[in-house]
């Protein structure tokens, strides 16, 4: 059998509402449950599924079907948690609200049933909601017919309380360990705590605490799952801490001290995981509740330590608020009264710490001692202390912080009596008024009993130091307390027996003689033999008792110690070698220590460096591992999110395709039904009952319609043909008979028309006459009102005219004022615009004049620059010409000298003289190429060649005077320099002329190039500036800063 087709949520909701309307709520719940738990529901949109869930949880609450609600809510959470978390919160809040409303209604109903009884507490006496009917209650209901309040509550209220408890537990199970539903989870947990507190459900509170504890433990176990909570997140951890603090408060209110202590441990575990410190207000609550727990468990030592931590926290909060470093929201509000109260409780709780052991047995066994140490270590960690507290440490800390000044006067006096000026004979008389004041305070009354134990302990310890035996009556008289806290002799004897049993006291009671005998047997006290016999509160407190004198037992125990000390002192005085050996050993040890100190220090430093490196390496490794883990987790989460997104997209795509197919199918079916209806109503003779809509399509329907229309057309044509044939003969016969009666009918018609006309005419005349008479009468009645109307109209017209004139004149005045104002504004605006135009014109003229002046200055500068450039160019041309002439003459002299040397070697005649050489025409040679790049506007090689030719054609005297002029010219690095003028001229084979100038200093090639490539804007020293009589030419001036050509143009 195929599965039933999937129904839309809207149809399911409508069906359920119909069933509810006819009183079939269970059937409606079954329909909704089947739809919600169906796998096909996952593809339904959340917006259409939410109303179904709201009705579903409402029916579950009405019918108390918790299991069905749990199944449906689980399924709904899996559907909606990836798309819309808000709808889950709406449904669950509705579920809880309905359950709470049912409990309230059940309470009202129970009150109505038991209206004759007094109003009792809002909770029944059922201890466990999961075990309501016990055999005792069933037997009691059977044998007793009395209708009591408890029985009414058990029958009416308790089932709904159980359902509400199951509701909270179901919601917490659904929301657990889901980061997207975490806020709702914490809110539900707080509501569950309030439920337990309101109805005093201690058993359910224990189960709730265990449930939350398991959820936190499973959070770390399933941290790799999608949407898992992360306890490393500060916000998540803070929410869990808030929940645990509320759990602690409820546990203290319900006086469930074991659960409160476990809540303290949970809070301490969460605080150890937190990366940021907890708020001071939370820690103040933590220490306050911890102090109450220790007080209930009679652990007065850790109770006093908790009060000490609480006071320190209050002091730090007050200092932080005073310095402006914290906010009032994060720090508890502290007043002077609060500080006084806290200081008093710190001092009073420290005084209440027992001086001797409070354990019930001697406890000298190793396993018991180890268990006690482990317990103390746990409690110390809960308090956040480095080492276990002690009575002396707490007193020393209190005195250092000045608590005596802040404490109440009676507490200060109590401290002085017990710890400073303790006197056994007058202790009770001094402390009686203080105990009365303490007992009058409900909060301090709890410390009276431990204070009595401390007083009795001190009393017997000091009596044992002074007396060997005392009368019981004397002891009873010493141990007298105020009336509400009186101690009986039996209680004193019980205290003595417990102290002797634990080894803290060595007392024998003789009831026959009525005497207390303090044990003088030097071997009777086992206190020294059992180091673990004392409790944690008193193991180091024996020395704090005021020592009046040593007992015989103590003298016997210390005999060997005293003998050793005496012998040691005697040896020091009698035997010098003893001292020398000891001194030598001491010196040797000191020398070894000094020798090894430096090495040990270096080793310590090296070890410290190594430890630091290892720590850094471990930290780096841990951070790297955390980063890698976070990266892997992030990648995994991204992959899961992408896969989830892809799945949702695929599902959305499939749902869209299915919706389109369904819509197309629905439209097709509607069109087919519409066409069938049209066919049924428009075309006769078609039976559509036998037609299957599933197999029917548009083409077949069109063919059926056309066939039927064709059939109808043929039948109609046949009927028309038959009827026309019959009508032709009948109509001809009718018309022949009508011709005989037409004149008579015409005359009768004329007569009827005339009668009708006369009747209508008479009626019209009558109505007109009546209307005229009525109008004339109305005129006569209204004519009396015409003068009054005229006078009233005239009066109204005059008033309106006067008012109009007033308004017209006011409007004219306003118009004139506006007109004047407008004229003034226009004139002012025109004057301002004219001033602006004039100012603009002045600025424009000034700008034009300035631009013209700048242009003229620029042109003048440009002309000046061109003139300077032309002058410099002319100077350079002249200088190049002179240098070329000098070079030509030098070359000729070298050639003559070479010719003379060659003639001397060969024995020939001397070559012609210089004058003869000059007379010969100059032979044209190839131009000298200056391979050094030139910058500027220097002469070309053709110009230089022309200058050489002109110099060769000059007369001889000019050539003879050239060397004298040559000395006065500065050396140019850009042109040719003769060998005898260079720094290395002595290496030349030719001897320079005697009348030539002295050799100049060698200038490197790059400096010559830079000198030859200087811009024309640099100034040159004129040739006449160099003195002719100096041996060395004057040094060239320092090169000026180079200026770009565009800036030279601007200047």
Swiss-Prot record:
One of its GO terms (biological process) is translation reinitiation. Residues 339-523 form the PCI domain. Residues 92-121, 608-905 form a coiled coil. Pfam families: eIF3a_PCI_TPR-like, PCI. InterPro entries: EIF3A (IPR027512), eIF3a_PCI_TPR-like (IPR054711), PCI_dom (IPR000717). Signal peptide: none annotated. It comes from the Eukaryota. Residues 948-961, 1010-1039 have a biased composition (Low complexity). One of its GO terms (molecular function) is mRNA binding. Keywords: Coiled coil, Cytoplasm, Initiation factor, Protein biosynthesis, RNA-binding. RNA-binding component of the eukaryotic translation initiation factor 3 (eIF-3) complex, which is involved in protein synthesis of a specialized repertoire of mRNAs and, together with other initiation factors, stimulates binding of mRNA and methionyl-tRNAi to the 40S ribosome. The eIF-3 complex specifically targets and initiates translation of a subset of mRNAs involved in cell proliferation. PANTHER family: EUKARYOTIC TRANSLATION INITIATION FACTOR 3 SUBUNIT A, EUKARYOTIC TRANSLATION INITIATION FACTOR 3, THETA SUBUNIT. HAMAP family: eIF3a. This is Eukaryotic translation initiation factor 3 subunit A. It comes from Aspergillus fumigatus (strain ATCC MYA-4609 / CBS 101355 / FGSC A1100 / Af293).
């Amino acid at each position: 059998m195929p599965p039933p087709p999937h129904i839309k949520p809207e149809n399911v909701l409508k069906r359920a509402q119909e069933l509810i309307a006819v009183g079939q709520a269970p059937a409606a719940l079954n329909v909704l449950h089947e739809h919600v738990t169906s796998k096909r529901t996952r593809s339904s949109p959340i917006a259409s599924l939410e109303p179904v869930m709201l009705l579903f949880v409402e029916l579950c609450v009405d019918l108390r079907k918790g299991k069905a609600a749990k199944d449906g809510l689980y399924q709904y959470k899996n559907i909606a948690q990836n798309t819309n978390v808000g709808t889950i919160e709406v449904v669950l809040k509705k579920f809880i609200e309905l359950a709470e409303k049912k409990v309230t209604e059940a309470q009202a109903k129970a009150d109505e049933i038991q209206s004759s009884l007094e109003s009792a507490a809002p909770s029944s006496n059922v201890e466990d909601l999961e075990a309501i009917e016990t055999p005792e209650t069933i037997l009691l209901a059977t044998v007793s017919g009395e209708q009591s309040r408890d029985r009414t509550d058990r029958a009416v209220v308790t089932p709904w309380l159980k359902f509400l408890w199951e509701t909270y537990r179901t919601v917490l199970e659904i929301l657990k360990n889901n980061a997207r539903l975490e806020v709702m989870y914490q809110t539900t947990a707080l509501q569950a705590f309030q439920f337990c507190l309101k109805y005093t459900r201690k058993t359910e509170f224990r189960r709730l605490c265990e449930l939350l504890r398991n959820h936190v433990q499973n959070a770390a176990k399933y941290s790799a799952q999608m949407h898992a909570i992360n306890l490393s997140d500060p916000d998540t951890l803070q929410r869990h801490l808030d929940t645990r603090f509320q759990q602690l408060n409820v546990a203290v209110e319900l006086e469930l001290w074991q659960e409160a202590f476990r809540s303290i441990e949970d809070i301490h575990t969460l605080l150890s995981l937190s990366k940021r410190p907890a708020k001071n207000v939370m820690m103040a609550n933590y220490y306050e509740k911890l102090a109450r727990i220790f007080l209930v468990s009679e652990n007065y030592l850790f109770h006093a330590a908790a009060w000490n931590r609480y006071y320190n926290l209050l002091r730090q909060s007050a200092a932080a608020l005073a310095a402006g470093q914290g906010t009032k929201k994060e720090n508890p509000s502290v007043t002077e009264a609060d500080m006084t109260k806290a200081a008093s409780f710190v001092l009073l709780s420290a005084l209440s710490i027992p001086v001797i052991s409070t354990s019930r047995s001697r406890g000298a066994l190793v396993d018991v001692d180890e268990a006690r140490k482990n317990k103390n270590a746990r409690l110390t960690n809960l308090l956040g202390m480095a080492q276990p507290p002690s009575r002396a440490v707490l007193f020393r800390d209190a005195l250092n912080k000045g608590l005596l000044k802040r404490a109440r006067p009676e507490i200060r006096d109590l401290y002085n009596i017990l710890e400073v000026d303790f006197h056994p004979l007058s202790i009770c008389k001094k402390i009686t008024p203080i105990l009365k004041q303490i007992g009058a305070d409900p909060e301090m009354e709890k410390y009276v009993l431990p204070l009595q134990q401390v007083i009795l302990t001190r009393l017997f310890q000091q009596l044992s130091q002074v007396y060997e035996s005392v009368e019981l009556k004397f002891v009873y008289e010493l141990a007298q307390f105020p009336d509400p806290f009186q101690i009986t002799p039996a209680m004193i004897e019980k205290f003595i027996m417990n102290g002797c049993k634990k080894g803290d006291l060595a007392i024998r009671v003789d009831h026959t003689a009525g005497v207390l005998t303090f044990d003088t047997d030097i071997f009777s006290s086992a206190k020294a033999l059992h180091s673990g016999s004392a409790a944690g509160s008193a193991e180091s407190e024996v020395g704090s008792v005021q020592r009046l004198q040593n007992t015989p037992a103590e003298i016997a125990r210390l005999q060997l110690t005293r003998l050793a000390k005496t012998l040691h002192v005697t040896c020091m005085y009698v035997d010098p070698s003893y001292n020398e050996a000891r001194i030598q050993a001491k010196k040797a040890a000191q020398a070894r220590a000094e020798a090894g100190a430096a090495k040990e220090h270096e080793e310590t430093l090296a070890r410290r460096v190594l430890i630091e490196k290892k720590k850094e390496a471990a930290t780096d490794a841990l951070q790297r591992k955390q980063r890698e883990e976070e990266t892997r987790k992030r990648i995994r989460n991204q992959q899961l999110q992408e896969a989830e997104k892809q799945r949702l997209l695929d599902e959305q795509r499939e749902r869209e395709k299915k919706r389109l197919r369904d819509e197309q199918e629905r439209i097709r079916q509607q069109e087919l039904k519409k066409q069938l209806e049209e066919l049924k109503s428009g075309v006769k003779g078609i039976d559509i009952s036998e037609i299957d809509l599933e197999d029917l399509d548009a083409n077949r329907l069109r063919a059926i319609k056309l066939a039927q229309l064709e059939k109808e057309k043929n039948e109609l044509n046949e009927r028309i043909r038959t009827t026309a044939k019959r009508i032709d003969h009948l109509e001809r016969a009718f018309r022949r008979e009508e011709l005989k009666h037409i004149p008579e009918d015409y005359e009768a018609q004329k007569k009827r028309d005339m009668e009708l006309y006369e009747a209508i005419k008479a009626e019209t005349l009558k109505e007109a006459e009546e209307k005229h008479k009525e109008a004339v009468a109305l005129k006569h009645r209204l004519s009396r009102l015409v003068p009054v109307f005229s006078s009233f109209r005239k009066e109204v017209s005059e008033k309106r005219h006067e008012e109009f004139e007033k308004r017209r004149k006011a409007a004219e005045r306003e118009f004139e004022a506006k007109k004047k104002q407008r004229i003034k504004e226009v004139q002012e605006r025109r004057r301002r615009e004219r001033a602006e135009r004039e100012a603009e014109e002045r600025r424009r003229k000034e700008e034009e004049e300035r631009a013209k002046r700048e242009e003229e200055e620029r042109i003048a500068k440009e002309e000046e620059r061109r003139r300077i450039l032309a002058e410099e160019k002319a100077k350079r041309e002249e200088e190049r010409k002179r240098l070329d002439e000098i070079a030509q003459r030098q070359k000729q002299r070298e050639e003559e000298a070479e010719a003379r040397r060659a003639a001397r070697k060969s024995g020939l005649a001397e070559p012609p003289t210089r004058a003869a050489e000059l007379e010969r025409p100059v032979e044209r040679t190839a131009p000298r190429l200056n391979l050094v790049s030139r910058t500027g506007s220097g002469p070309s090689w053709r110009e230089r060649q022309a200058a050489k030719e002109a110099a060769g054609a000059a007369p001889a005297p000019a050539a003879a005077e050239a060397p004298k002029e040559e000395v006065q010219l500065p050396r140019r690095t850009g042109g040719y320099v003769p060998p005898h003028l260079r720094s290395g001229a002595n290496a030349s084979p030719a001897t320079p002329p005697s009348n030539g100038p002295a050799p100049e200093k060698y200038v490197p090639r790059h400096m010559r190039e830079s000198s030859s490539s200087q811009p024309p804007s640099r100034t040159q020293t004129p040739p006449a500036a160099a003195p002719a009589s100096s041996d060395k030419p004057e040094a060239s001036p320092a090169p000026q800063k180079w200026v770009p050509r565009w800036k030279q143009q601007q200047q």
